[in-house]
Amino acid sequence: MNPSQQHLPKLCPKRLFLFFTPFLLFSLYYILTTIKTITISSQDRHHPPQLHVPSISHYYSLPETSENRSSPPPLLLPPPPSSSSSLSSYFPLCPKNFTNYLPCHDPSTARQYSIERHYRRERHCPDIAQEKFRCLVPKPTGYKTPFPWPESRKYAWFRNVPFKRLAELKKTQNWVRLEGDRFVFPGGGTSFPGGVKDYVDVILSVLPLASGSIRTVLDIGCGVASFGAFLLNYKILTMSIAPRDIHEAQVQFALERGLPAMLGVLSTYKLPYPSRSFDMVHCSRCLVNWTSYDGLYLMEVDRVLRPEGYWVLSGPPVASRVKFKNQKRDSKELQNQMEKLNDVFRRLCWEKIAESYPVVIWRKPSNHLQCRKRLKALKFPGLCSSSDPDAAWYKEMEPCITPLPDVNDTNKTVLKNWPERLNHVPRMKTGSIQGTTIAGFKADTNLWQRRVLYYDTKFKFLSNGKYRNVIDMNAGLGGFAAALIKYPMWVMNVVPFDLKPNTLGVVYDRGLIGTYMNWCEALSTYPRTYDLIHANGVFSLYLDKCDIVDILLEMQRILRPEGAVIIRDRFDVLVKVKAITNQMRWNGTMYPEDNSVFDHGTILIVDNSIK
C-alpha cells in the first residue's frame, strides 16, 4: 500500500448518498423550473401549465365602502389578459372593490338566505369552482404598514380600514374616533363609554382576573375589542367575535389593532370551538336574545364554557334593571326578561354569584351530580346524548346540556393556572385524545421549541418585532404557538375539522386559542389579517381534497402586504406550491431542513417585506 494513502479515511457510500441527495434534488428542481419557464414562454400565456387559469367569468356584488352598502354595484371585472402581456402567467389583481372581500360572508349572496335565527349571518361559502375567484385581493389605496405593537392597540391608519360609519355611530360611546389620517381607540364601549378600566374593575372586584385561573375568554359582540385589549394586562387571551352587520368593520378594527378576533354569530350552527374551551364568556349589550328558542344560545355558551367557568353579562335586562332599581322605578317587561333568564340558568344549574352595576355574573357547576335529579324532574332540557361534544364544524346547536365529567374524574380535568397551564394538559391524562401520550406531547413541545429557534436564528422573523398577528394553519397540539409565547405575538391555532385525533381541545387546555377550519373554504376573517402564516403539512393534507391553488389564494387574501409565510412540507409538494406562489408574485425560497435538527421535509419561506 502506498504510505501516502494509508491514513486516508474510508469513504462510506451510504453517507455520500445521504450527503449529496439534497443537493441533487434541488439541482433537479431548478433544472425542471428552468425548462418549465421556457415552456411557458412558448405556450399561450393565458393558460399557465398544469394550473387552472386565473379567471373571472361572472358578475359578483360586493360593497366597496360603507356609503354604498345598501345597494352594492356589480363588480368591475378585469379585461381578459392580452396574449402579448409578459405578466399574463401571473394571477391578475382583483378589482378595487375586492379590497374587503369576504368569500363566506358576502352581503349580496347572504340575502338569499332566511333571516330566521340570523341564518343569513352564518358562513355561506362558494360551493362550486365556478363561484370562486382566481385573482389576488388588492390592498386599499393609500395602505400603510400597520402601527407596531403595542402602539397598534391605540391607533390604526384610516386608509387601512376606510370606514367612517362606526366612528360616527359610536362617537358618544368612545368606541373609536377619527383624528386626521388615523383612528384612535380611547377604550370605550356601549356599556363603558367612560372607559373600559372602570368596567373591568367591577368584574375584578368579584373574579380573580390576575390569579392566572382565568386565561381564555370569549367576548360575544365584541365591538372593537376594547374589552379583550384591556384583559391583556392580566395575561388573559380573548377570542373576540361579532357578525358582519351594519357595524361591518368592528372585527376588522380589532384585527388591525393586533387583537385576536374573527367573524362569528350565535345563530344556527355551533361555534367552531371544542367543549370546555373558555374560562369566561362575556356579553356586553351583544344584542343576543338569550331566552329565545328555550335558551338554546345559553346552552351553546354552556358547551364551550369550562366547569366552574364564569358568564359575565351587562346590558338589558341587567343594567337597566339595576338602574331602574336605583331610581325606585320598576319595569315589568325588564323584570319578565330577567325572570326568564334566571329560569334558563336554573335549568343549566348555574349559580348567580354577583350582581353589581353594570354586570351580573353566573358560574357554571364543576359537575352535574346534584343537577341530574333537577334535570330529570324538569324534563327539559336533558343532557346531550351526542358522543362527541367537540364536533362543532357546521353542526347545528342542540337543545340540551353538554354533560360534565363524572365527579370521580373532576380532579383529572382541573387546569393549572397560567402560565403552568401551557405544559399541563388534562385531556391527555384522561385519555380523551386517542393516539397521543404524555411522552408524545413532551416530544412535540421540544421539537417545536427547536424549530422556532431555527426559524429565528436563520430567518430573523420573530425577534424583529414586525409580526403581531400569526396563524398556524395546522396547529396539531399547539407546539408552534407555545414556542412563540415569549414573543409579543398571538397565534390563531387552526385544526382541520376532520383531522384525527381532534387536538383543538388540547390547544385550549394549554391556554391558547384557535378554531376549527376546512381549508377548502375561506376563513371567517377580513383580508390583510395576519402578519405571519405558518403552514405545516397543510398541502399534503389537502392534495386529494381540493385545489391547492385556492388554498394559496386564500392565504394571499388574509396575509398583510408585507407579511411572511413559512410552509413546511414534503419536497415534491413544495415544488408544486412554489410554482404557484411564483405566479402570485411572492418572493419564495426553498430550504432543506437540517437533519440534525428536524426529522424530514423542506421549508418554503416567503418574505414579502423584501422587494
Curated annotation (Swiss-Prot):
Primary localization class, coarse: endoplasmic reticulum
Pfam families, sorted: Methyltransf_29
Parts of the chain that traverse the membrane: 16-36
Residue spans, topological domain Cytoplasmic: 1-15
Keywords, ordered alphabetically: Endoplasmic reticulum, Glycoprotein, Membrane, Methyltransferase, Signal-anchor, Transferase, Transmembrane, Transmembrane helix
Signal peptide: none
Lumenal topological domain residue ranges: 37-611
Disulfide bridge positions per record: none
Compartment(s) of residence: Endoplasmic reticulum membrane
GO cellular component: endoplasmic reticulum membrane
Membrane topology (UniProt): Single-pass type II membrane protein
Enzyme class, broadest EC rank: transferase
Protein's UniProt name: Probable methyltransferase PMT19
Organism listed in the record: Arabidopsis thaliana
